[in-house]
A protein has these predicted regions:
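Cys/His-rich microdomains that often coordinate metals
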Residues: 35-38, 57
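Short, flexible, mixed-charge glycine/proline-rich loop motifs
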Residues: 18-28, 39-45
């Protein structure tokens, strides 16, 4: 294998990593390197190493970004839904509407949060951020 610069500015050697593939794998909750191993050991707890390829995943620093992105996405749908419902059915009880849309927002947030965190971890891995620039594995 010939060495190429994956990131000339950072002086990182290795193969190019596909950002879209890594983000898709993370979105599905799989290792961004091999796509086989699990990314999470619990709801939002990331495994230290992939059980299949051994890629170290403890370097991830998703922090609060997945929550902000989730709020951005869910908020747009909930606000649009509330406004559309108010336009179409103006006589509905607003307390009931508030309860229903609040529950929908919580459910959508809980469903999206680990997927968005996985996609963000995949992006960090592909961009070799936060210590993900180590030696290449045989996968990918």
């Amino acid at each position: 294998m010939t060495e190429v610069y994956a990131n000339p500015a950072a002086g990182v050697y290795g193969r190019e990593r596909s950002t879209s593939l890594a983000m898709r794998r993370g979105l599905m909750g799989c290792c961004p390197n091999c796509g086989e191993g699990r990314l999470f050991r619990a709801y939002l707890k990331v495994v230290d190493n992939c059980s299949v390829c051994g890629e170290e995943l403890k370097h991830q620093r998703a922090d609060d970004a997945p929550a902000y992105i989730t709020i951005l996405i869910v908020g747009h749908f909930v606000i649009a839904g509330v406004l559309a419902e108010d336009e179409l059915y103006p006589t509905l009880n607003m307390a009931l509407v508030g309860i229903v849309w609040s529950l929908a927002a919580v459910a959508a947030s809980l469903a999206l949060l680990p997927r968005i965190k996985g996609a963000l971890i995949g992006f960090q891995w592909a961009a070799r951020m936060h210590g993900f620039g180590g030696p290449e594995k045989e996968f990918v």
